[in-house]
Amino acid sequence: DKERTVENIVEETRAALKKSNIKGPYILMPHSISGIYSLYYANNYSEEVKAIIGIDPTLPQMSEYFGDDVFPTMPKYTEYMAPIGIARLLAYVTPDNILPLSEKGTYTEVNLKMAKSIVAAKYINKAVVKETNEIKNNFDLTTNMTFPSDLPVMIFTPKEQYVEGKSKIDFYNTQLQNIKNNKLVVLEGQHYLHWTHYKEMSENLNEFVEGLK
């Protein structure tokens, strides 16, 4: 029931790793909003982070770079979508909105059925609503943080163009320019690149990690 602040999320992650007896330093692999959490983790516990490999990660400077200061929010009633069965209904009526975008045969029917079940049980739950409503505060808290210059960072980004010629490619390059060991991998696709480019990403990931030894 804790608030979904970046501080709480990172501390819970650290506690889970410790309780599971998983020893650091760790290679963090954030996707989307967890980019904020990995940035906070690396800035506050640098000795615990060996590298960061991001999949289209959200970073606090995005808001200013793209001129977008509108942050998503969710009304409290949405946290009841799973308990009263609305999430289950959506999972089966509009499966294309929640199942991985991938070539036919990539996932087995068992995998897809499991994905539907997870969505039905967890989709827009209480924690998700709280986390969404905390995004602006988490942005504000990390707005002056950048990747440490001695921290290896690789980012996978979709090839997307935005208004006035700005793109995620340009943005991520600005974030990586002062990092000694960095790599930006551009892929055709959407936000969930790991659904469609898992093979290419695995090759790049293994090569990058091998170079850290």
Task: Locate predicted features.
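A catalytic-pocket lid/entrance helix-loop region that shapes and gates access to the active site
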Residues: T58-L90
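Conserved hydrolase catalytic core segment
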Residues: G24-F66
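Catalytic histidine-centered segment of alpha/beta-hydrolase-like enzymes
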Residues: L184-K199
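Short aromatic-enriched loop/helix-cap "lid" or pocket-rim segments at secondary-structure transitions
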Residues: D1, S63-D69, T73, S167-K168, ...
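Conserved serine/cysteine hydrolase catalytic core
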Residues: T108-N178
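Short, hydrophobic alpha-helix immediately C-terminal to the catalytic nucleophile
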Residues: R14, L39-N43, S202-N206
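Active-site loop/oxyanion-hole signature of alpha/beta-hydrolase fold enzymes
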Residues: D1-M29
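Post-His helix in hydrolase/transferase enzymes
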Residues: W195-V209
